[in-house]
């Protein structure tokens, strides 16, 4: 089947933002203008096309990122709508992994908010080029220029306006396009009656100032344009666009535009911006991975290359079963063909292939390089797995997901539903890598763990709705961690000789605190421990580190060097060295000044001035550490770091303190040492 659009006409992009910045409404408007929806879905009345899970329609927030295909001006757009609620960062993380570009939506009255920072950092990690759309310009308190300065101050991004607004709040009428030097004015609420006019006289000076700043920023990123600029030559519209496109794709500039999605002003210009400035699959570097021998390999975006694709999301559909949302990086995937899941080393048959439009679908015969679609019929494929050609296998880099920070015990209301609940939880864990479930061996209880209270609420809600399992839920528990504060040397000898073959393993280790991942270094010289037993020592240490000595929590941020040991010709075995490694770790930890760590959240609270003293006092009583305050649109925004264990039930407390006028958001920030008294309390609770 011939391509409908060449690869350079593809735009795979996401729409990302803080909760309530108007992301889903913006996507709805894109679908409306690109001709897929005939009536615009409103998030307010629960009819939005992109928010298709029942819980999303009720809560008015986006939980699962729905991938949608549409067309605009001879380009194919694949849009991924990502949730802005902090508990669903996994959705943002996995969609960013497969995007080529993104539109960051900001609320014109709030600017950069905590979740914007989180999502921005995630996009930085994957090097995703972005443009910024300042939405809700019609809202009270809207301020485009303050918004742009929050991007520069809080995100350290080189935000360059390529439009400036005409009017704001209820007087928002349109924008000035600085590239083409014209005013775009809207005369109706559906964005149909839109006219280009000369720039109004009262805006001429401001437009000139911002246009000069924009031209200078674009010229700085391009030597040829810089020469023209310095020599005072006129830079054409085409040159400006080409220069801006290059700088945006290189992450040197973030073009900024404005609008009001709800009032249908500025959305078409935003889609034009996506086409003009965000990358096609050909503009991004070749995707990297490793072949089965562990050597580096890469694939270019081309139909003629061997197939490589990444399954970035697994969803269960009531009608067709398991859907694997997939990005094709190279080659062609055909329905009915066989591919290799190189991550798991298993062959898979491609059943049907569909292109998704939110939650309706169109069947296709094949998906080509650069396309996004869903595969039906895969048996063994999970999130982050690579699907590739059997002849030329490649394993693409998988995705990293954060560990859960909160857990609750859960039990079905009837004994008969126990098995059903187990199967349902396994299905949900397959869909969402940040959701974990296990059985507590001491109590026999089923534990579910996730990224926040809302995350677990929705899991329990889905159990009831989709799987018809009603559950009782216990009080939330915090996922503490343990670590060490000083470097030590320790040893352990495991010896068992009681007739017949004995056991013997002896390991001497040095252990020290470190920032970041666990590191094991083999420093054995002269064969004190035979090479084949060294991985066993490492395994013993890793296994023992899952249960620290203070309160049995996972031990993090440490490094181990295996420096010496001894073995027995007959009695030594992998098992003996594994036990020796585990014992050496426990001995070392006891001497290394162990401490308990707790998750600390970055909290942002917005309250009217009169409640500020009370709210700050409350934050301090929760062991909060103030980071700063500022006034935004007549309200006070308080920023602080607060331990997660102190934030349970905060929504209710804030509501009663501020008569329902305060709002807050929080995002996991880091782990930090707990005070001695709390460490003793946690350790005491664990031993009860």
Swiss-Prot record:
| One GO BP | ribosome disassembly
Q: Which PROSITE patterns match?
A: G_TR_1 (PS00301), G_TR_2 (PS51722)
One GO cellular component assignment for this chain's record is: cytoplasm
Keyword set, alphabetical order: Cytoplasm, Elongation factor, GTP-binding, Nucleotide-binding, Protein biosynthesis
- A Pfam family recorded for this sequence: EFG_IV
Q: Does the keyword Signal apply?
A: no
**A GO term, aspect molecular function:** GTP binding
As for subcellular location, the record says: Cytoplasm
Q: Does the keyword GTP-binding apply?
A: yes
Query: Which residues pair up as cystines?
Result: none
Which Gene3D superfamilies does the entry link to? 3.30.230.10, 3.30.70.240, Elongation Factor G (Translational Gtpase), domain 3, P-loop containing nucleotide triphosphate hydrolases, Translation factors
Listed binding positions for GTP are: 17-24, 81-85, 135-138
Residue ranges of domain tr-type G in the record:
8-282
Per its UniProt record, what InterPro entries does this chain match? EF-G-like_DII, EFG_II, EFG_III, EFG_III/V, EFG_IV, EFG_V, EFG_V-like, G_TR_CS
HAMAP family in the record: EF_G_EF_2_B
Q: What's the stated role of this polypeptide?
A: Catalyzes the GTP-dependent ribosomal translocation step during translation elongation. During this step, the ribosome changes from the pre-translocational (PRE) to the post-translocational (POST) state as the newly formed A-site-bound peptidyl-tRNA and P-site-bound deacylated tRNA move to the P and E sites, respectively. Catalyzes the coordinated movement of the two tRNA molecules, the mRNA and conformational changes in the ribosome.
Q: Which family does it belong to?
A: Belongs to the TRAFAC class translation factor GTPase superfamily. Classic translation factor GTPase family. EF-G/EF-2 subfamily.
Q: What is this protein called?
A: Elongation factor G
Q: Which organism is it from?
A: Clostridium botulinum (strain Eklund 17B / Type B)
């Amino acid at each position: 089947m011939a391509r409908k659009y060449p690869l350079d006409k593809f735009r795979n992009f996401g729409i990302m933002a803080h909760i309530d910045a108007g992301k889903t409404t913006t996507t709805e408007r894109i679908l409306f203008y690109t001709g897929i929806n005939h009536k615009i879905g409103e998030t307010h009345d629960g009819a939005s096309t992109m928010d298709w899970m029942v819980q999303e329609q009720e809560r008015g927030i986006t939980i699962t990122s729905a991938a949608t295909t549409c067309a605009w001006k001879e380009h194919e757009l694949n849009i991924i709508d990502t949730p802005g609620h902090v508990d669903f960062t996994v959705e943002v993380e996995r969609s960013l992994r497969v995007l080529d570009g993104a539109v960051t939506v900001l609320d014109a009255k709030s600017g950069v908010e905590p979740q914007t920072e989180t999502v921005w950092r995630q996009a930085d990690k994957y090097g995703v080029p972005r443009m910024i759309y300042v939405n809700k310009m019609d809202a009270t308190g809207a301020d485009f220029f303050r918004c742009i300065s929050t991007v520069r101050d809080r995100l350290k991004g080189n935000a360059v306006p390529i439009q400036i607004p005409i009017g704001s709040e209820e007087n928002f009428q349109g924008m000035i396009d600085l590239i083409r030097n014209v005013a775009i004015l809207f005369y109706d609420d559906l964005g149909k009656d839109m006219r280009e006019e000369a720039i109004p006289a009262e805006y001429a000076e401001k437009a000139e100032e911002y246009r000069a700043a924009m031209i200078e920023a674009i010229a700085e990123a391009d030597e040829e344009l810089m020469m023209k600029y310095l020599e005072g030559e006129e830079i054409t519209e085409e040159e400006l666009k080409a220069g801006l496109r290059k700088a945006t794709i290189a992450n040197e500039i973030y073009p900024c535009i404005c609008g009001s999605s709800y009032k249908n002003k500025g959305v078409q210009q935003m889609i034009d911006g996506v086409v003009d400035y965000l990358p096609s699959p050909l503009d991004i570097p070749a995707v990297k991975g490793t072949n089965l021998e562990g050597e580096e390999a890469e694939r270019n975006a081309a139909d003629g290359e061997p197939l490589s694709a990444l399954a970035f999301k697994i969803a269960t559909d009531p009608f067709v079963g398991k859907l694997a949302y997939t990005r094709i990086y190279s080659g062609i995937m055909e329905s009915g063909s066989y591919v290799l899941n190189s991550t798991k080393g298993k062959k898979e048959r491609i059943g049907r292939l569909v292109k998704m439009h939110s939650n309706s679908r169109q069947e296709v015969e094949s998906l080509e390089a650069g396309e996004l679609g869903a595969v039906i019929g895969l048996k063994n494929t999970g999130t982050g797995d690579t699907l590739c050609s059997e002849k030329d296998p490649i394993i693409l880099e998988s995705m990293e997901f954060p560990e859960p920070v909160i857990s609750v015990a859960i039990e079905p209301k009837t004994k008969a539903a126990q098995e059903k609940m187990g199967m349902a939880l396994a299905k949900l864990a397959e869909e969402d890598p940040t959701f974990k479930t296990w059985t507590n061996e001491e109590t026999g209880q089923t534990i579910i763990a996730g990224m926040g209270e809302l995350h677990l609420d929705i899991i329990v809600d889905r159990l009831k709705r989709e799987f018809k399992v009603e559950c009782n839920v216990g009080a939330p528990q915090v996922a503490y961690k343990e670590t060490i504060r000083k470097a030590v040397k320790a040893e352990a000898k495991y010896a068992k000789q009681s007739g017949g073959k004995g056991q013997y393993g002896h390991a001497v280790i040095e252990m020290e605190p470190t920032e970041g991942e666990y590191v094991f270094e083999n420093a054995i010289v002269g064969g004190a421990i035979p090479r084949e037993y060294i991985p066993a020592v490492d395994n013993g240490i890793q296994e023992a580190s899952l249960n620290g000595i203070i309160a049995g929590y996972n031990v993090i941020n440490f490094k181990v060097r295996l420096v010496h040991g001894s073995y027995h010709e007959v009695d030594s075995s992998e098992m003996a060295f594994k036990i020796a490694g585990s014992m050496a770790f426990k001995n070392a930890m006891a001497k290394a000044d162990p401490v308990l760590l707790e998750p600390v959240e970055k909290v942002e609270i917005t309250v009217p001035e009169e409640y500020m003293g009370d709210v700050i006092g409350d934050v301090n009583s929760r062991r909060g550490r103030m980071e700063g305050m500022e006034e935004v649109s007549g309200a006070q925004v308080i920023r602080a770091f607060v331990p997660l264990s102190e934030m349970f039930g905060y929504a209710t407390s804030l509501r009663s303190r501020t008569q329902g006028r305060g709002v807050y958001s929080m995002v996991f920030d880091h782990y930090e040492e707990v005070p001695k008294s709390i460490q003793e309390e946690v350790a005491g609770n664990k031993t009860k």
